[in-house]
Amino acid sequence: MKNLLSLCFLMLAAFTLNPAAAQEKQSIFDVSNSSLFSNDDEFLKVDQAFAFNFYQKNNLLEVSFDIAPEYYLYRHQFKFKGKNTQFTSVLLPDGIDHEDEFFGVQKIFTENLAFTVNLENVSNDASIKITYQGCAEKGLCYPPTSKVIKLSKFILGESTSAPSSDAAQQTNEGEVKKSEQHQLSDMLKQDSLLLTLIAFFVGGLLLSFTPCVFPMYPILTGIIVGQGEGLTTKKAFTLSFFYVQGMAITYTLLGVVVAMAGAKFQAVFQHPIVLIGLSILFIFLALSMFGVFNLALPASWQNKLNNVSNKQKGGSITGVLMMGVISGLVASPCTTAPLTGALLYISQTGDVVLGASALYALSLGMGLPLLILGSSGGKLLPKAGAWMNIIKNIFGLLLLAVPVFLLERFIPEVASQALWALLILVSASYFYVANQNHAAAQNVQQGKGFWYGLRSLVIFLMLFFGANLAYQLIYPSSNNVTNNAQHASFKQVTSLAQLEDEVKKANMQGKTVMVDLYADWCIACKEFEKYTFVDADVQKALSNSVWLQIDMTEFDSTDNAELVQHYTILGLPSILFFDLQGNELTKQRTTGFMKAAEFSAHVKSIFK
């Protein structure tokens, strides 16, 4: 059992300490793909995108939609509900096929849509509610919209046409299947609160297996393991439970506040000063795992919290709860698809109570594996012994990975890579010594124990990854040289007036303009610089464009606040494009990370 456990920890360390592995798994949970932070001014309002009209003559209700270019309605999202009337099944046109990234081929309507509803038994105060939902090709999905049509009794020759937009009531019902975040957003709009909470709990459970939650595992396990030999299953469960509650409280409050405050709140808690402070905190926590000092509340505090914490050794319920709050706030800052869905709903409807409940359920789902892992500290782990010091040291190394994870958002890439290489090599060296000592203690001849060999393989892989990172630092590839050279092509702009002046200068030279709004705390901004802007096709597509860049790290500075207000910037990264007349092409604005091929195609479609 001990050998198997040691192998699991070694493999866990080998994976979590590999930044490349974490990068590959961001996929749809990445904040950069979130529609929450897209600029609403890029898109038409729902009634402009899908102009609604109807005409009633006797028992026939003719309904039509004038769909704007680059917008579409989902066929399967149409729903009909009658009040004081009956109607036969509505026969909609077939529509055209549309490839949906997450839900396969869907039928959609573009340009114009018309259909007829056959009414029966229309009584007084009769009405029919038509619910529909559509999206913009640029990446925004509207919430389901409903129009309530007041019907007239069958009077030969009498007809009723569409009322003004004020008369048509809009609600938020139906289902969205454009993307995961919008699907989850609109689940909140269903009648069943229980089903909504279950859906978000499952979403959180799936989310718990992504790199976004990675920092929480070493933090919680470090707290549990740090309790020492006196740890029991009950105490481990209690500590884990309150840690998860702290995390859940954070996500619930964070989601509501972010929905109200937008990217300014995000900027504060991703500020370098905050990240440095938290990195120092986790370094101290790691040192405690190595036995440099013991973490314990002052005696006076312990006495005051005696009734609450049952004199828990090495900490308290309050302390663990606060650690969960901190972990949820900063150590796992990814705005994921489930979280984005809840935020999107809150921002659109203002239903904070329902949104907060869903976020809490999402957090509990995220915390379930954490709860199981933490509770295992008193049940599944072997009994006290020398192995405990090894495990504490392992989690000390994992805790040291958290500061690197936080700092790499604003430190130079070469420094981040050096920290990862150093940490992996030091960890591999430690594991090698521990493996040798374990083999000697078990009287296992070198090269002959199965578990010894398997542990050695894991150590070898760690050494390989660490050495590979170190090699890239010492002998950078030509691509890195290209990256550094390409960054110099940006001209820095600091104010709205300077931006307008630079656009005029570019237009006088017959050039268009691309403006990159970035911040040091913005991961997706760094991805743009590393993967997209250096691409040859992207550079060719923008060869006749002046590249401007605005540092939005201090989001609330006077100059940046003016830019934010003028261009209605809700989140980063945002890429603005200006034509030869100096006009911003608002519908072509890019918000969120785009891969090089996609971005190149986007630029080519703009500047043909």
Curated annotation (Swiss-Prot):
Name of the encoding gene: dsbD
UniProt subcellular location: Cell inner membrane
NCBIfam families linked to this entry: PRK00293.1
Membrane topology: Multi-pass membrane protein
Segments for region (Disordered): 161-180
Gene Ontology MF: a single term: protein-disulfide reductase [NAD(P)H] activity
Function summary: Required to facilitate the formation of correct disulfide bonds in some periplasmic proteins and for the assembly of the periplasmic c-type cytochromes. Acts by transferring electrons from cytoplasmic thioredoxin to the periplasm. This transfer involves a cascade of disulfide bond formation and reduction steps.
Chief location of this protein within or outside the cell: membrane
Pfam families with a match to the protein in the record: DsbD_N, DsbD_TM, Thioredoxin_7
EC number: 1.8.1.8
Gene Ontology biological-process annotations: cell redox homeostasis; cytochrome complex assembly
Stated name of the protein: Thiol:disulfide interchange protein DsbD
Biased composition (Polar residues): 161-173
Keywords annotated in UniProt: Cell inner membrane, Cell membrane, Cytochrome c-type biogenesis, Disulfide bond, Electron transport, Membrane, NAD, Oxidoreductase, Redox-active center, Signal, Transmembrane, Transmembrane helix, Transport
Family: Belongs to the thioredoxin family. DsbD subfamily.
CDD domains given in the database record: DsbDgamma
Entry's transmembrane regions: 194-214, 241-261, 273-293, 314-334, 352-372, 387-407, 414-434, 456-476
Domain of life: Bacteria
Catalytic activity: [protein]-dithiol + NAD(+) = [protein]-disulfide + NADH + H(+); [protein]-dithiol + NADP(+) = [protein]-disulfide + NADPH + H(+)
PANTHER family tied to this protein: THIOL:DISULFIDE INTERCHANGE PROTEIN DSBD
Enzyme class, first EC level, given as a word: oxidoreductase
